[in-house]
Amino acid sequence: MHVNPLIRVGVLVVVCLSAVTFSAADKAKLDDFARCLGQKKAVMYGAFYCDHCKEQKDLFGDSAQYLPYVECVEKGTRKVTEQCKTLAIRRTPTWIFEESGDRIDGKVLSLQELSQKSGCRLP
């Protein structure tokens, strides 16, 4: 069966536009989720050289910029900041959930785990 090339192009355009719209909507939801963590006083403490911290941030993609994040190491020195010394942050990432008093040291948390601990709705 022969299909008109214009129909093929039209279908392709609709599919591409749907994918872009879906991605933008998902990104906005992930932005909201990251912001909610901050509102619920769930804070990630990390270090710029920490692979697991990068892995944690990567779960959020571009939305990582909205994560409540505290850098525990002064860049270029590897000296631990006073705030992180006071909180006894020894392994990163460390998540502290102020509202519940929970603390998880040295573990990458899934979005599901972050949702359960914080009360923020998953996107």
What are these regions (language model features)?
Residues 48-52, 73-75, 90-91, 101-104, ...:
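Solvent-exposed loop/turn segments at secondary-structure junctions
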Residues 36, 74-83:
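Structural microenvironment flanking redox-active thiols in thiol-disulfide oxidoreductases
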Residues 26-68:
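Local sequence-structure signature of Cys/Sec-based thiol-disulfide redox active-site neighborhoods
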Residues 96-123:
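Non-catalytic, surface beta->alpha helical segment in thiol-disulfide oxidoreductase systems
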